[in-house]
């Protein structure tokens, strides 16, 4: 069956590389190295999630990504880095995580058929 990639933090950047280098539909969460790879063009649909209060990924970097890839859905949540990880008690944000999960599942449902 169809394959997709999802990644968080370092894996978020790896998910971007899956879309740009391997042509695999991908969703990346707060991938800090994605900005360094923004010259690469997605060969498959992808979606990105970031936190507005992420101390590792400035919103200016997210703006650069948006400008370079205007057709790539990018969602920014009022949360910090690692907002999706419920083991990170200082940064987990249930509302942001739930919405990001809903968007991620909708993305894959539409593309992995």
What do the predicted segments below correspond to?
Residues 53-57, 81:
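Acidic catalytic loop of the alpha/beta-hydrolase fold
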Residues 42, 47-50, 54:
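Short beta-strand/loop motif that positions the catalytic acidic residue
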């Amino acid at each position: 069956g169809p394959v997709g990639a999802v990644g968080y933090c370092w894996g978020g950047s790896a998910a971007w590389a899956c879309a740009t280098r391997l042509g695999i539909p991908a969703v990346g969460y707060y991938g800090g190295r994605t900005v360094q790879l923004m010259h690469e063009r997605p060969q498959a649909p992808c979606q990105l999630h970031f936190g507005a209060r992420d101390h590792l990924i400035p919103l200016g970097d997210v703006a650069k990504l948006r400008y370079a890839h205007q057709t790539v859905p990018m969602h920014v949540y009022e949360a910090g880095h690692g907002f999706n990880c419920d083991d990170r008690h200082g940064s987990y944000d249930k509302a942001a995580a739930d919405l990001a999960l809903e968007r991620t599942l909708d993305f894959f449902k539409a593309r992995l058929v």
